[in-house]
Amino acid sequence: MPGVPDNAAGLRAANARLRELLAERDAEIAVLREQNSEIAVLREALAALQSQVADLAAQVKKNSRNSSRPPSSDGLAKPAPKSLRGKSGRKPGRPKGQPGVTMELTDHPDKKVRHRPAKCGCCGKSLKGAEVTAVERRQVIDIPQVRAKITEHQMLTLLCGCGCETKAAAPDGVTAPVQYGPRLMGTGIYLWHGQFLSRDRACRALSEMFGRAPSPGALAAAARKAAGLLAPALKAITEYLVSAEVVHFDETGFRTAGKLAWVHSASWGKFVLVTVHAKRGKDGMTAAGILPFFRGIAVHDAWKPYDTFENVAGHALCGAHVLRELVAVTETGTDLDRAWAQQAIDALLALDKAAEDARAAGGTAISPDLLAEHEGWYRKAAETGIALNAGRTGKLQEKRHALAKRMKDREDDYLRYARDLRVPFTNNAAEQAIRMSKLRIKISGCMRSMTGAEEFCAIRSYLATAARHGIGALDALTSAFQGRPWIPETG
């Protein structure tokens, strides 16, 4: 048979050759297996790198509009403004028919200065004694130079006919041979804790404006005194908030004595209370004195320690926070992710508008059919988000899954504003209440001691509440230093 060896030697040679071929094949198979193993490792590494790149890209895209970052972190390249509410149809500028704010001439100026031309503009003759035919009025609003005045109180000692000497009592608050008065000290505290100048700069400003100024140490002592004088006002604010039906709560970092402390805020309507504590969580919230005794609806973000207060009637989660999270999904997710996130955004905003319209019309509830429709869209969006990100491969999917699951699990809290018109859609009021503490840090740096931070928060609570009641900060502080702090009515 052709090709078949005709002897044993030929068979052995062919067999040896086959063994060589089999060995080569086994070696190639081993190499391929090793390569497959390496490819699998490389694929895993590539997937991990792709996930990291996606996470980093999402981080780069984060700004104050789609995350919890403050607007100050946007830098010079601020994101283009976008309104989730869509176009209102209103043109920019002052609405037609609305009165303007042009300064008007007053009929009762404090001072009048008449300017007469000396000679005729045509023939050059003197105009002395000439008849006045017209008057053009122009007014300049300015402030006169203000210098501190020194008032000396002399307590006389009088001798009675019976031989007894009686000395007059000093006026209230006049306790030292030389001291600064309530308006000067009130102005100093206003510049320091009202306008956030540093303590030294506040003293320099007083000196330059009024010719007199306390030392930085004396101003610090005045702040300590003011915080003590404000105790009755702070007590009234606390009592009002504890008994309120709805209260906003928030917290933010506040660098103090080289460490991170936390400012906690509670506010509703015209009342604001800010406190400071070393802890952000339940300890700090408890020390503020509102949440442990509160029986109303607490409006806040999804920070878990708020949920540990079971004495409250209910929780309402901030709509602005969840909108920012959903906007981030629309900007970084897949087409399917964008769809469910946008659906949730539309449902939340539609319910917010319906709630606003109902309040404006004097109603107490949204139309049941409208409420049910948008609740359904919201619910379906959350369920879709959970299903699409069930694999949770990578941080982005984990975040989207967590967001959708939270929306589903806490539907009652996210939609409470639509079911109870007393509840606002956002927690912006609480953020506004603590914004001044961040502004203070930006302008004049951190607080040097926890005691100083506590004094700052006490004064800010007083000033913020006074401002919401139409009371000027300077007047409120002056009254406090006169021993008559303004106390809000809570009835």
Q: Model-found features: residue ranges?
A:
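Catalytic center-proximal scaffold of phosphoryl-transfer enzymes
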Residues: P2, A23, A54, P95, ...
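Short, flexible loop/hinge motifs at secondary-structure junctions
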Residues: M1-Q179, F249, H300
